[in-house]
């Protein structure tokens, strides 16, 4: 499994801590100064919205301040559902955690009141309240709470390690809250400022003298954004607070909740403090389970200077962890990285090399067959790194891409793991035998699948347009579903013939959500797809019949391509939901643009990515920009480099949420037989849609 195909967090609802930008303590925002252009007489301004079909200045909407956040909350917190709601808490909590990690706070208090207000209080330095030099008449606190990208985490002077650029998070929480009350104890006084829906209700006030230090943010999410009756879940808040305490052993987090808000077994009061950090976390997670070694491999290394710190805990169990054989939960600067990244790669490499070296030392020749997947297959692992200036892949910050993190983690764990193995030969031998057994089982499964796949291929009447892969193993085999012969031709040239098969589909894909059973049965394209997969639909689906490990939908990076992908996902959801639950369905992410200047070229997946490249990689330059009209336009080498090469591509795994009823409702609304449901959905969700829509 490639790093880009990683399964999301397996730690239950604790993955609600998934990161989005977070909140500051020193504002440093440089207003952009544009050069003064030569005056050009403007045309008469439009005073009213233009007529249908026309496009004028009246159609241009300028969103100022925090209005973009309220208009498009999904861009900042990933939606407006329960998970997104709890992101607000994660943002505020991350700010206080950064104060603790920096050594300025020891205690954090989390409180959910009867009126639905949630407060997070710390005993850190307190947000700065002095006037901001770049914003006359505004305090630094007001800038922090009302200006996107204002924060004290850019220069590294206020924080060496932080969970993100928290000026984004504080202002986003403010924008999406009905009311926010920020109390700061600093400079000998208690200060208070109140906000509503992103706007201050008045200037900052000096309430009373006080010797205390710290910050308290008390807020209530806005029903206009999240819907009536959407409230914080005490159980989820409790788990999130407890997880943060595990991640930094130097902090104490106090939890309290009004009893009227609790409808389960969540304690109304609790104090979280874990002196052993992740080792305590793992002990709680593995309570009652039989482990291969009596003690887990756990530790913490701090490196002076630029490197940072790493903490880890790992154990192995023969029975697995509930629905999963194993899990790996990772964090960077206390923020979850559910998609993994370089710190996980270093962790896996250190364990694998250490165990193989131990096998060689003991003369165990079977140790050569061990892979990293064998080592972590039935392991419960936790890893947390603290590094300066972390780099993440994508805007969601769920995958760490800092290359130094891999080297740092691997180097830090190498000697401690060797020492742990050598200090208890009996336990080390038990672990080695256990991992070798996993490796031998893996090789046996591969051999059985090769025989099974070869036998199934001989029995099946595969569609003639399928360009099948040459290999007989199911593991690693991939089926790319592409649109039309043109794209299919490019894909066939770009593929790895041993592992990658290509199935071009012609014509419009049938919408199975609105089609009758007879139409579905008679549809040749979908029949060919079923034949290629080898598995049957509905209750007759058997995963062992599936001829490929990954089914990858590869369509053009435009609206038409997205429509075809939606139809195919609907097909799999309605006819083979177990294929999705098994983690076999993926979306390829081909680029939409190619930017080139001199000898350098970059690919952009969408307009936002293109603008980002223009502002960074090609800043001050005028690159040649080409737009791909379709996959068939791309050279085979380009398609391979950007979309099909497992070492370079990015895949999006299609998953189903825990509560699948919402998915069924959405599929029926958008893809079903009732156009009035689609029309109502568009009316409620497409705020800027003013043009005629083809329903």
Curated annotation (Swiss-Prot):
Q: Where does Mg(2+) 2 bind?
A: 556, 558
Q: SMART domains recorded for this chain? A: HATPase_c, TOP2c
Q: Which PANTHER family match?
A: DNA GYRASE/TOPOISOMERASE SUBUNIT B, DNA TOPOISOMERASE 4 SUBUNIT B
Listed under catalytic activity are: ATP-dependent breakage, passage and rejoining of double-stranded DNA
Ranges of biased composition (kind: Pro residues): 36-46
Key word Metal-binding present in the record? yes
Entry binding sites for Mg(2+) 1: 483, 556
Superkingdom field: Bacteria
Enzyme Commission number(s) from the entry: 5.6.2.2
Every Toprim domain range: 477-591
GO terms for MF: ATP binding; DNA binding; DNA topoisomerase type II (double strand cut, ATP-hydrolyzing) activity; metal ion binding
Tell me which Pfam families the record gives: DNA_gyraseB, DNA_gyraseB_C, HATPase_c, Toprim
InterPro entries in UniProt: DNA_gyrase_B_C (IPR002288), HATPase_C_sf (IPR036890), Ribosomal_Su5_D2-typ_SF (IPR020568), Ribsml_uS5_D2-typ_fold_subgr (IPR014721), Topo_IIA (IPR001241), Topo_IIA-like_dom_sf (IPR013760), Topo_IIA_B (IPR000565), Topo_IIA_B_C (IPR013759)
Q: Where is this region: Disordered?
A: 1-53
- Say which family it is in: Belongs to the type II topoisomerase family. ParE type 1 subfamily.
For this protein, the record's HAMAP family field holds:
ParE_type1 (MF_00938)
- Subunit structure, interactors included: Heterotetramer composed of ParC and ParE.
Indicate what this protein is called per its UniProt record. Answer: DNA topoisomerase 4 subunit B
Q: Name one GO cellular component term.
A: chromosome
Question: How does the cofactor attach, per the note?
Answer: Binds two Mg(2+) per subunit. The magnesium ions form salt bridges with both the protein and the DNA. Can also accept other divalent metal cations, such as Mn(2+) or Ca(2+).
Which organism was this protein described from? Caulobacter vibrioides (strain ATCC 19089 / CIP 103742 / CB 15) (Caulobacter crescentus)
- Positions bearing the site annotation: Interaction with DNA: 508, 511, 563, 678
What is the required cofactor set for this protein? Mg(2+); Mn(2+); Ca(2+)
- Keywords, A to Z? ATP-binding, DNA-binding, Isomerase, Magnesium, Metal-binding, Nucleotide-binding, Topoisomerase
**Where, in this chain's numbering, is ATP bound?**
55, 95, 122, 164-170, 397
| Function summary | Topoisomerase IV is essential for chromosome segregation. It relaxes supercoiled DNA. Performs the decatenation events required during the replication of a circular DNA molecule.
């Amino acid at each position: 499994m490639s790093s880009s195909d990683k399964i999301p967090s397996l730690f239950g609802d604790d993955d609600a801590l998934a990161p989005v930008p977070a909140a500051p303590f020193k504002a440093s925002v440089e207003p952009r100064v544009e050069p003064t252009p030569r005056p050009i007489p403007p045309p008469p301004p439009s005073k009213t919205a233009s007529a249908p079909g026309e496009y004028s200045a009246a159609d241009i909407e300028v969103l100022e301040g925090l209005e973009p956040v309220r208009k498009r909350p999904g861009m900042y917190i990933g939606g407006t559902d329960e998970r997104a709601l709890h992101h607000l808490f994660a943002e505020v909590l991350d700010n206080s955690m950064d104060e603790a990690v920096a050594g300025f706070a020891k205690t954090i208090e989390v409180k959910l009141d009867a009126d639905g207000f949630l407060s997070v209080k710390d005993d850190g330095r307190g947000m700065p309240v002095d006037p901001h030099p770049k914003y006359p008449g505004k305090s630094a606190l007001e800038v922090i709470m009302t200006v996107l990208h204002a924060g004290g985490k850019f220069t590294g002077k206020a924080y060496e390690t932080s969970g993100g650029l928290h000026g984004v998070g504080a202002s986003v929480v403010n924008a999406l809250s009905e009311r926010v009350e920020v109390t700061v104890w600093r400079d000998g006084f208690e200060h208070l400022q109140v906000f509503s829906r992103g706007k201050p209700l008045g200037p900052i006030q000096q309430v009373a003298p006080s010797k205390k230090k710290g910050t308290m943010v008390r807020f209530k999410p806005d029903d206009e954004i999240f819907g009536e009756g959407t409230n914080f879940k005490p159980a989820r808040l409790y788990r999130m607070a407890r997880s943060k305490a595990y991640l930094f052993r130097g902090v104490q987090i106090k939890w309290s909740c009004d009893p009227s808000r609790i409808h389960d077994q969540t304690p109304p009061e609790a104090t979280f403090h874990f002196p052993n950090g992740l080792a305590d976390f793992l002990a709680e997670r593995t309570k009652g389970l039989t482990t291969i070694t009596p003690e887990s491999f756990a530790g913490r290394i701090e490196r002076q200077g630029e490197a940072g710190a790493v903490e880890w805990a790992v154990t192995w169990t023969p029975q697995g962890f509930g629905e999963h054989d194993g899990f790996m939960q990772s964090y960077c600067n206390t923020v979850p990285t559910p998609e993994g990244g370089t710190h996980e790669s270093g962790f896996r490499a250190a364990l694998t090399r250490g165990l193989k070296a131990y096998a060689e030392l003991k003369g165990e020749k079977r140790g050569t067959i061990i892979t990293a997947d064998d080592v972590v297959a039935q392991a419960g692992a936790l890893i947390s790194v603290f590094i300066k200036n972390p780099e993440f892949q994508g805007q969601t910050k769920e995958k760490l891409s800092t290359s130094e993190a891999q080297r740092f983690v691997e180097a830090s764990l190498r000697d401690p793991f060797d020492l742990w193995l050598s200090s208890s030969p009996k336990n080390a031998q038990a672990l080695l035998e256990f991992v070798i057994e996993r490796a031998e089982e893996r090789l046996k499964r591969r051999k059985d699948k090769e025989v099974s796949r070869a036998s199934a291929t001989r029995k099946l009447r595969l569609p003639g347009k399928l360009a099948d892969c040459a290999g007989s193993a199911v593991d690693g085999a991939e089926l790319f579903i592409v649109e039309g012969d043109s794209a299919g031709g490019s894909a066939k040239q770009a593929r790895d013939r041993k592992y990658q098969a290509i199935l071009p589909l012609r014509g419009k894909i049938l919408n199975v959500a609105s089609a009758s059973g007879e139409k579905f049965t008679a549809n040749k394209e979908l029949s060919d797809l079923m034949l290629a997969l080898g598995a049957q639909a509905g209750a007759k689906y058997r995963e062992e019949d599936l001829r490929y490990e990954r089914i990858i939908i590869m369509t053009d990076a435009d609206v038409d391509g997205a429509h075809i992908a939606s139809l195919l996902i609907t097909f799999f959801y309605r006819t083979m939901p177990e294929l999705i639950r098994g983690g076999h369905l993926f979306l390829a992410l081909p680029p939409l643009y190619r930017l080139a200047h001199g000898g350098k070229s970059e690919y952009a997946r969408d307009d936002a990515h293109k603008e980002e490249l223009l502002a960074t990689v090609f800043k001050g330059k005028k690159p040649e920009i080409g737009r791909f009209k379709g996959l068939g336009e791309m050279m085979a080498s380009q398609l391979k480099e950007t979309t099909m090469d497992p070492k370079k591509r990015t895949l999006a795994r299609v998953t189903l949420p825990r509560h699948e009823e919402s998915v069924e409702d959405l599929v029926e609304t958008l893809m079903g037989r009732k156009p009035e449901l689609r029309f109502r959905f568009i009316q409620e969700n497409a705020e800027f849609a003013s043009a005629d829509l083809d329903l």
